[in-house]
Amino acid sequence: MPPKSRSTGPKKTQKTRRRDKKNIPHGAAHIKSTFNNTIVSITDPAGNVISWASSGHVGFKGSRKSTPFAAQLAAESAARKAQEHGVKKVDVFVKGPGSGRETAIRSLQAAGLEVGTISDVTPQPHNGCRPPKRRRV
């Protein structure tokens, strides 16, 4: 019995799903600023992420990710993407002890988003995990 020939017809191309533009005038900006990185997520009122950016995503590597300038560029990038979806006003929620907290908030304002309330939602342990040992330099 001869082997079955494979069809060499047209290849099926897989469609990539394009994100449709939503019109969300009011959102929330979540800024997570750690000692190593800064992540900015802009969400709709239900908490679904519209746009995000981080210091590493913007193009910084290593210890430069933790700088305030990297946080500024990350916030500008996230704000630009969010404005394409119609976001004009945001409430800011800041989490973490990093150096890019204030810079990220200022650059959201500079990018054209109106900042409503600013809340610090850094989690505080009620004597939970033991913290890492002190650095000796």
Swiss-Prot record:
Residues 1-10 have a biased composition (Polar residues). Residues 1-27, 116-137 are annotated as: Disordered. One of its GO terms (molecular function) is rRNA binding. Pfam families: Ribosomal_S11. GO terms for cellular component: ribonucleoprotein complex; ribosome. Belongs to the universal ribosomal protein uS11 family. This is Small ribosomal subunit protein uS11. It comes from Rhodococcus erythropolis (strain PR4 / NBRC 100887). The lineage of its organism: Bacteria, Bacillati, Actinomycetota, Actinomycetes, Mycobacteriales.
